[in-house]
Amino acid sequence: MSKQTFTTTFAGKPLVVEVGQVAKQANGATVVRYGESTVLTAAVMSKKMSTGDFFPLQVNYEEKMYAAGKFPGGWMKREGRPSTDATLTARLIDRPIRPMFAEGFRNEVQVINTVLSYDEDASAPMAAMLGSSLALSISDIPFNGPIAGVQVAYVEGEFIINPDKAQQEASLLELTVAGTKDAINMVESGAKELPEAIMLEALLVGHKAIQELIAFQEEIVAAVGKEKAEVELLQVAADLQAEIIETYNADLQQAVQVEEKKAREAATEAVKERVIAAYEERYAADEEHDRIMRDVTEILEQMEHAEVRRLITEDKVRPDGRRVDEIRPLAAEIDFLPMVHGSGLFTRGQTQALSVLTLAPMGDTQIIDGLEPEYKKRFLHHYNFPQYSVGETGRYGAAGRREIGHGALGERALAQVLPSLEEFPYAIRLVAEVLESNGSSSQASICAGTLALMAGGVPIKAPVAGIAMGLISDGTNYTVLTDIQGLEDHFGDMDFKVAGTRQGITALQMDIKIEGITPQILEEALAQAKKARFEILDLIEATIAEPRPELAPTAPKIDTIKIDVDKIKVVIGKGGETIDKIIAETGVKIDIDEEGNVSIYSSDQDAINRAKEIIASLVREAKVGEVYHAKVVRIEKFGAFVNLFDKTDALVHISEIAWSRTANVSDVLEIGEEVDVKVIKVDDKGRIDASMKALVPRPPKPEKSEAKKEGKHD
């Protein structure tokens, strides 16, 4: 296929899609040019079905530093592992694409997005999402798209699609929404305490823009799309399924209704093991043994899935016996750890998170060096999910995509209420340790984070709480669930996380397993989430009503002083020599910004005071009219040089030593002698003139002698 180009304008910027020129050996490939951003997307599919029990989809978002005209930082001058932003963008693209493949599809699919040119005013992630959908849609890969995504900002009461950098910085909303022509299927958002009504309107505005992009894609698919390949779907034998359901469904139904998680898992596992053992014995010698046993396992999963959903939709009974809008039992505690800067323990049913606060000087902020201009990140929220939290063994090591994503969600939720740098000049790190999990652990980490911040004396604007909403839908009827647990998340159709204050929403995240949900469901879920959020906030405020007025004794104290910008180099010294000496002598940490704000940190107030004194003396300036107790350091014929303080000297001219005539300076002063002087002049070059005689009264002029008077008459 020769190169074909498709052009439109979207959100005020040119949008160009090129097909047929590059990456032609992939199943599908596109080059999307949006503004000055350019993204290459290639989609490929394995020829055979994988043997795993899940759909192996991999979506990558690769940031090439050359795209922004930047040289890679660090000693390795080559792109390495994906940045946090790249990982989050890959997840953002994966989530709306994944539900668009058929049930039982098991061929491995990879979608690789490479940013070739980066324009900070034209969203490369949204270009990559469009490219991913198009590459799959025009390929022979069985994909039930297209989908599209947009960013939505809210500036001065107006919604803006795919805002530029300045609009993003002015916005009260940072929303990414994706979906199909008919419905929304992915949401990711941070917001400055916006009400539910505005959030819902933003979603609808975003979906309307999505429909434009889908219409554009449909034109391209009609022109260059390939015929979809016939692939084998994972399907179980109907007769085997009927037999197992008839024989064992009643036992499995009973096991599923056990309310306590561990007991329920044990009961369902016992039924499954009995079924597997029976069929293992029956088909041990059968040549189709592996396929049959795979089917048995899949059938049991489907039976559990169907029973959990039936109980909720028909009987309105949840696995643990709760009402559909009921939260699990709550508990909150502060000061769980003695030596840290703040800690909070939050428990919701069998989900528990410990959040630990650490405060540090601004010099410890994380430097982010990606495609955007380098910047410093003041607030970090890290989320850890050890396998023991679910009673299992597993991999331990670097944070995976899920942990990075959950940490970022908590970061967005809590960042909206943090004090400004001027109010609270600290770098802030929260670490959420999930100690126990049965669903909604990311939202528990937000609640625990609020407790830790308030216990640590961080003056947040308001407490934040989070809740996860679920959905069970059969296409006609649906049930929205409050505070979903693990089983409801696994077998349900939606995981909709909502975090916020009493004032409004600070973060949203929605993933669904069906092709989309309606505005009515979104509105109902947001209303139900608000009620639950307020209930959790009641508990948080009962535990700690407001942030403590003081920091923990172990937290670094801070003091700030302002110096003239031209004195910064004096405090730092040649090669940092002076500031390093101050730090070594006092044990403090010191940060100096470009405007001359000096921040001094230490857990020892005396050390801070000593450092302040040293810095104050370094930047001290002599002022006209001030009096100093000085030391003579040099004598010349025309006067004496005296040291006022530190490295600041002044000249006492011979005429300023005394009111009477001084013949020789050395007759009156000697080196090392201490004298009081008054500054009488500072010129534009900083040279200082001082006077000794200005500190003593001028003697009266002598009266003329009578003799002289008489002599004049002679």
Curated annotation (Swiss-Prot):
Residues 691-714 are annotated as: Disordered. Its main location: cytoplasm. The keyword Nucleotidyltransferase applies. Disulfide bonds: none annotated. One of its GO terms (biological process) is RNA processing. Its EC number is 2.7.7.8. Mg(2+) binds at residues 489, 495. Keywords: Cytoplasm, Magnesium, Metal-binding, Nucleotidyltransferase, RNA-binding, Transferase. GO terms for molecular function: 3'-5'-RNA exonuclease activity; magnesium ion binding; polyribonucleotide nucleotidyltransferase activity; RNA binding. Residues 625-693 form the S1 motif domain. The keyword DNA-binding does not apply. SUPFAM superfamilies: Eukaryotic type KH-domain (KH-domain type I), Nucleic acid-binding proteins, Polynucleotide phosphorylase/guanosine pentaphosphate synthase (PNPase/GPSI), domain 3, Ribonuclease PH domain 2-like, Ribosomal protein S5 domain 2-like. It comes from the Bacteria. InterPro entries: ExoRNase_PH_dom1 (IPR001247), ExoRNase_PH_dom2 (IPR015847), ExoRNase_PH_dom2_sf (IPR036345), KH_dom (IPR004087), KH_dom_type_1 (IPR004088), KH_dom_type_1_sf (IPR036612), NA-bd_OB-fold (IPR012340), PNPase (IPR012162). Residues 556-615 form the KH domain. Its cofactor is Mg(2+). It catalyses: RNA(n+1) + phosphate = RNA(n) + a ribonucleoside 5'-diphosphate. NCBIfam families: polynuc_phos (TIGR03591), PRK11824.1 (NF008805). This is Polyribonucleotide nucleotidyltransferase.
